[in-house]
Amino acid sequence: MNQLKNDRYLKALLREPVDMTPVWMMRQAGRYLPEYKATRAEAGDFMALCRNADLACEVTLQPLRRYALDAAILFSDILTVPDAMGLGLSFGAGEGPKFARPIENKAQVDNLPIPDPESELQYVMNAVRTIRRELKGEVPLIGFSGSPWTLATYMVEGGSSKAFTKIKKMMYADPQILHALLDKLADSVILYLNAQIKAGAQAVMVFDTWGGVLAHNEYKAFSLRYMHKIVDGLIRENEGRKVPVTLFTKGGGLWLEAIAETGCDAVGLDWTIDIADARRRVGHKVALQGNMDPSVLYAQPERIEQEVKQILAGFGQGSGHVFNLGHGIHQDVPEQSPKVFVDAVHEYSKQYHK
């Protein structure tokens, strides 16, 4: 594998000294880029794009051609794992994901296979290998998965949800069924992420998009417990380097201390948290990723720069901060905004790393 030319993202995750704060954007390969829309049209549909290693590689690299990003993230979807379990995933035009066979009972959970990453999910590993080759060591490649809880919400609800009534009914009325599902998902995610690491991912991230809808104790019992299991099961060193792991719960500011206790290297922050407060609470144990509100990118360049400066000042001196948005970039942001954002992070962060 190629020698890494820019490793400040990996170093910051391990709280090692860097020359400036590294930055990437959640959903940086995506619909806000006209070239992404063209490639997706060429693929035919979203899952066809995910399954074509060359096209998945192309959209992964597109934002790196425009912006001085410090990491690439695999272009894929969190629902690849439940799809490989045979639930019949589809994406309707202009609609969110739908599962033809949602999980309703114990028998269905018992019959769910644990997917083999190098067979049912081989297309993801092929994409990782292709992207890693084409990156030529410019920046590291991030692999990722959804968290067991977040994957389970889609599998039980049958798609996206606002109220999460079906999965919460299962959680309170039949908790043993949900625990069995989450346990199987955790085992599947461990295999999946370890396969991504073996294929060339140099860091991994677990997206717990819906952990924040849970009550205080239920978050720990039904979400964090299974992310902890994943952290314990991951390959943490490959190609002679540590492979850092980041856990991100949207709405997880209440539980930063508990998340930091899992043994992860970094905790992702959404925009509702004051990064100075987060660093005071857990900065001695983990790196922090975040946490600008993605909607700031609608603002004028001066306002974007002001927000970047504020977050950098909030984190303060030294390494241990990966700058990012607090969630995925919106698809209709002005074309120049991401460049203003990325360049501002690099320019204004140097003073914090002297």
Curated annotation (Swiss-Prot):
Gene3D superfamilies: 3.20.20.210. It catalyses: uroporphyrinogen III + 4 H(+) = coproporphyrinogen III + 4 CO2. GO terms for cellular component: cytosol. Keywords: Cytoplasm, Decarboxylase, Lyase, Porphyrin biosynthesis. The record marks D77 as: Transition state stabilizer. Pathway: Porphyrin-containing compound metabolism; protoporphyrin-IX biosynthesis; coproporphyrinogen-III from 5-aminolevulinate: step 4/4. CDD domains: URO-D. InterPro entries: UROD/MetE-like_sf (IPR038071), Uroporphyrinogen_deCO2ase_HemE (IPR006361), Uroporphyrinogen_deCOase (IPR000257). The keyword Lyase applies. SUPFAM superfamilies: UROD/MetE-like (SSF51726). Coiled coil: none annotated. Its EC number is 4.1.1.37. It is an enzyme of class 4 (lyase). Its main location: cytoplasm. Substrate binds at R27, Q28, A29, G30, R31, D77, Y154, T209, H327. It is found in: Cytoplasm. GO terms for biological process: protoporphyrinogen IX biosynthetic process from glutamate. Pfam families: URO-D (PF01208). GO terms for molecular function: uroporphyrinogen decarboxylase activity. Catalyzes the decarboxylation of four acetate groups of uroporphyrinogen-III to yield coproporphyrinogen-III. Homodimer. Belongs to the uroporphyrinogen decarboxylase family. This is Uroporphyrinogen decarboxylase. It comes from Actinobacillus pleuropneumoniae serotype 3 (strain JL03). The gene is hemE.
